Structure formats: C-alpha cells, structure tokens
Design a protein with these regions (language model features):
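Short beta-rich binding modules
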Residues: 1-190
Length: 190
C-alpha cells in the first residue's frame, strides 16, 4: 500500500483579489461546454440560455499567472437574455479589437474582417489588454476578480499584444467518452 506524507507540505495559500483598476495583458481560454455550434457554448442549469465560459490568465506584471473567469451570454429565451447577449457581443467585439489592434471607429474592410470569426473557437487563446475589476463578496462567497473593461487601441492604456499561434483549429475538442476509465478497488477494501 502506498503512503503519502504531507507533514512537510506548505500550508494552503489564500490569494487576495487583484486590485480593481489593474491594467494587464490577458489570454482568454474558452472552456467548451458541449452546447451550441461546435460545442463551444455552455448551457445554463435551467436550459434557457447559452454562454461562452471563459478563463482569463494574466500574462505580465505582479499578478502574472493569476486567473479569473467570466460567462458571456450569447443566446437565451427571455428579454433579459437578449439584453445580456447584446452586452456580451459588445464586450467580445472589444476583445477582438484589443487583441487585433483595431480602433472601434475603424470602418475599413480590414477592420470589419478583423471583427469577424468563423467559430467561437477562434476566440480561444486570444490575447488582449484588460482592466480588471472586483465583484464584492456575496451569498457567502469571497470577493472575486472579473473582466471590468477591455482596453482598445483608442485608449491611452492600450498597447500592442502578440498573439500566439492557435493551438487548435476552430472546433471544440472531442467530447470524452461518457464512460470514465475503470478505477480499481484498493486491496484493503476487498
């Protein structure tokens, strides 16, 4: 039987939130949810809306490697979902503009093309400049970071970012088999 000794392990760490207003370069990862075209969207628990489930990793500065998350509603069955989808579309447009160096007022054909994607998977891995906010504690949960504002090229705080080559094509990863790998029963429990 294996033995694991954690007596010399560090005690757990508690992270404070990244201060509100922090400007940082972040990389967005879309966490596929097996809903919507290509499986990139996540369906809500009640099944009435679909959203992009996104993780943001800070790439530079004192908070490098720290993460925060956001859902972008893209479809739903209520007027509230429609309004949320409109807000999300504006934020996603700003993410494309920040990451691709497009000023929001640019109406050129190149700018219009830069705001188009073939799949939500095209957003996966996109790097852009963000202002990080803080959601106050609620419902027994501690305060957490959120994407407060996307900094676009028309703003003083914006700077060019380097996009890494896409790691995967514009399709969601294959869904894992529904049957998990067999876990062998330990000898002591027989």
């Amino acid at each position: 039987m294996n033995s694991y000794d954690f007596n010399d392990a560090d005690t757990q760490r508690k992270f404070a939130v990244i201060p509100a207003g922090t400007i940082a370069t972040v990389r967005m990862t879309v966490r596929p949810g097996s809903a919507g075209e290509g499986g990139w969207l996540r369906r809500s628990n009640d099944g009435n809306s679909e959203a992009l489930d996104c993780e943001f990793v800070v790439l530079n500065g004192p908070f490098a490697k720290r993460k925060f998350w956001s859902l972008f509603t893209v479809a739903g069955s209520t007027q509230g979902h429609a309004e949320a989808a409109k807000i999300s579309a504006g934020m996603l447009r700003a993410i494309l503009e920040s990451g691709r160096g497009i000023k929001p007022v640019d109406k050129s054909d190149a700018a219009k093309e830069g705001r188009r994607i073939k799949s939500y998977g095209d957003l996966n891995g996109l790097t852009f400049v963000a202002r990080i906010g803080v959601e106050p504690p609620q419902n027994g949960y501690e305060a957490k970071n959120r994407l407060d504002h996307v900094v676009t090229p028309d703003e003083k705080a914006w700077h060019p970012v380097t996009q890494e080559p896409a790691a995967a094509p514009s399709a969601a990863p294959a869904k894992p088999p529904s049957t998990p790998a067999k876990i062998n029963r330990p000898d002591w429990s027989k």
